[in-house]
Structures are given as structure tokens and as C-alpha cells.
Regions:
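Conserved N-proximal alpha/beta basic substrate-recognition cap immediately N-terminal to
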Residues: 51-159, 166-170
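Nucleotide-activated donor-dependent transferases that construct or modify glycoconjugates
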Residues: 10-30
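Short, Lys/Arg-enriched N-terminal segments with co-localized hydrophobic residues
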Residues: 1-6
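Short beta-strand-to-turn element immediately C-terminal to the catalytic PLP-Schiff-base lysine
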Residues: 149, 192-197, 231-233
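ATP-grasp fold ATP-binding core
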Residues: 137, 168-194, 213-223, 228, ...
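Short catalytic helix/loop segments, enriched in acidic residues and glycine
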Residues: 29-44
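ATP-dependent carboxylate/phosphate-activation module, predominantly the ATP-grasp catalytic core
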Residues: 219-225, 229-275
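Short glycine-rich anion-binding loops that position phosphate/pyrophosphate groups of nucleotides
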Residues: 20-22, 96-99, 184-186
Length: 275
């Protein structure tokens, strides 16, 4: 069996990988979900010839898949892709948006004429940047008011946020009001700050958002945190399931704790509406 797999043509095989399991990540908070994703993908594609890029530590776990030709690596995944992507015609991969991994991997594959069953590099660039996403959906779907601000070295950003907060609050002075500050790029509630009182704003914010970085300032919307999983060909979107996300807000900071899927809600049909 092993020799047949090794003789498999790259043109007949789909290159697949998951970023963390291919990178040798050992953080249990990350790797348990990553392992579930890649092994579920292998199960879903059991009728196809696959080339799996995975860290060498998983060598004993992939022998049961007769349709899989494993490539066990110990080097950096991005380096491996830059040197080997040109050998393949098709690819499916799983990666988070951290550090622009999703965009960088998509761009490498596209530049090497690999057909991917993922979003395009351009789409990844937009969706990984919160303000680009806001601009692309402007006047298409309801969104909280949003403003992009640069954390400049002279501290003018503090005055800008202060003025923005007071302007928005003056429009509805009797309601409770909060704003949320987010990095332009980031996932899983990474480095978010919630301000209920503008007097809580201080230059300590530069410990979270260093000078030179850009942030998104938005209305904070109370409610249940959800997401929708969907399939899209660039024109048509097919919703698959509604997911609940568990976010802990403590000391005006947010921490992503995980999620539940599927999530049942009376608002499901509304969430599934496409434009």
C-alpha cells in the first residue's frame, strides 16, 4: 500500500493541510480543535486521493488512511509551500487569520497556479481586515458605526477617540453607551477593549495597541455572539449552520472560550438571509 501511495501523481492528488498540525503546534488550547478539523476533513475526503502535509509527530496517526500520501515535515510550513507548491494542481487547507496566515498561504498557492477550494487571496485580505470588511459591506448589511484610527506616537489618537465617543453619545444621551476598540487584524477577541466611560481611556492603551498600529472603534452592541458557517462560490452563498460563540468579558477585556454548533435560535432565518 505504501508504495502505491508514494507513486501517486501529484496532478491526481489534492494537497491538504491544517496550519497548526503542519506547524508542530503543541498548545492544547489550539491543537485539540486543529486535530479535529484536519482528521474530519480526511474522513470527508475518503473517496479522493490526498497528499497530506503534517508535522512528523503525527506519523503514527495517519497510517489508517489508505487514500492519503503523508508528507511529514519538520520545517516551517510557509517555507515548505514556497518550495513545493508548484508540484500540485489542487489544494484544500485550513488556517486561522492570525498574522495574515490565511492570506499568505492563499497567495503562495495562487502564485503557483494551484487551484484552491478555499477563498481567494483577495477575499482573505478583505475578511482578515475588519475595516476592509466594514467598507465592503457598507450599505449592504446592517453594521455598527465604525471608525479607523491610527495610534500615533504623539498621542493624538486619545483626543480622536474622546471626540468620537462624545459625538456618538450625544446622539442618544439617555441610553447606556459603550464603544469597543479592536485591532484591524486579529481573531478570537484578541486584544479587544470595551469602554463604558470615556474617562477610562488612558495612554495605557498603547500597551495593547503599540504606536503605529491602527485600530477599529465601534459601537458596542449588546447581545448573543453568533456566526454563520456557509459555502460560497463568489456570487451565491449557502448557509450551513448557525453557531454560538462563548466570549467572556472581564475587566473590560474579551476572551474567546469556544463555541457550540449548531445553535438554535428564533432568529436563525434572519441570520441565514443572503444579499
Amino acid at each position: 500500500m505504501g508504495w502505491c501511495l508514494l507513486m501517486m501523481s501529484n496532478e491526481d492528488s489534492i494537497l491538504i493541510f491544517e496550519y497548526f498540525t503542519a506547524s508542530g503546534e503543541k498548545d492544547k488550547c489550539i491543537i485539540s480543535e486543529a486535530e479535529a478539523l484536519i482528521f474530519n476533513l480526511l474522513d470527508d475526503l475518503k473517496d479522493y486521493n490526498l497528499t497530506l502535509v503534517i508535522d512528523k509527530s503525527y506519523e503514527d496517526l495517519i497510517g489508517e488512511y489508505e487514500n492519503v500520501n503523508p508528507i511529514l515535515i519538520e520545517e516551517n510550513l510557509i517555507d515548505w509551500l514556497e518550495n513545493n507548491a508548484t508540484k500540485y494542481k489542487k489544494a484544500i487547507f485550513i488556517a486561522a487569520e492570525n498574522d495574515n496566515n490565511l492570506y499568505n498561504i492563499s497567495k503562495i498557492l495562487e502564485d503557483n497556479n494551484v487551484e484552491t477550494y478555499n477563498s481567494s487571496a483577495e477575499a482573505c485580505s478583505i475578511s482578515s481586515n475588519k475595516f476592509k470588511t466594514y467598507e465592503s459591506l457598507f450599505n449592504i448589511v446592517p453594521q455598527p458605526r465604525s471608525f479607523k484610527i491610527k495610534i500615533d506616537p504623539k498621542g493624538y489618537w486619545k483626543r480622536a477617540i474622546d471626540n468620537l465617543y462624545k459625538k456618538w453619545k450625544s446622539e442618544d444621551p439617555l441610553s447606556s453607551f459603550k464603544i469597543i476598540l479592536k485591532p484591524l487584524n486579529g481573531v478570537d477577541c484578541e486584544d479587544i477593549v470595551i469602554l463604558e466611560d470615556i474617562d477610562d481611556l488612558s495612554y495605557d492603551l498603547e500597551k495593547i495597541f503599540p504606536p503605529g498600529s491602527r485600530i477599529l472603534v465601534q459601537d458596542y452592541i449588546e447581545g448573543i455572539d453568533v456566526s454563520v458557517s456557509l459555502l460560497c462560490d463568489g456570487r451565491n452563498a449557502i448557509p450551513i449552520c448557525l453557531n454560538e460563540q462563548f466570549v467572556e468579558l472581564k475587566n473590560d477585556r474579551g476572551t474567546y472560550l469556544g463555541g457550540r454548533s449548531p445553535f438554535t435560535s428564533k432568529h436563525k432565518d434572519e441570520a441565514f438571509q443572503t444579499h
